[in-house]
């Protein structure tokens, strides 16, 4: 019998999202100071948005609302992917997607 997940923190996708946040913070810590309010800030916001939207959607009453927040999280993933590509192209990161 499978247990019903009662807390968003038990979701593997939320846990992976938290790992992404930590990795992005480590990566952007190495960026030049002049990027603090540019790419650094944008990448951190995009990363934080991923598990945040998963958690918020989990707390919604209807599945339709939950799905909407999952779509928003997916959009944040696409934003972050683009920003990682930009950081690579600018020579700020060795990560290539």
Feature map (PLM): residue ranges:
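Amphipathic alpha-helical assembly/interaction segments
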Residues: 1-94
């Amino acid at each position: 019998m499978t247990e019903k997940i009662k807390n968003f923190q038990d979701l593997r996708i939320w846990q992976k999202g938290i790992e992404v946040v930590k990795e992005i913070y480590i990566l952007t810590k190495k960026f030049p100071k002049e990027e603090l309010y540019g790419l650094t800030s944008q990448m951190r916001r995009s990363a934080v948005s991923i598990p945040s939207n998963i958690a918020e959607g989990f707390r919604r009453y209807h599945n339709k609302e939950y799905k909407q927040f999952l779509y928003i999280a997916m959009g944040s993933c696409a934003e972050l992917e683009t920003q990682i590509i930009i950081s690579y192209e600018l020579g700020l990161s060795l990560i290539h997607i």
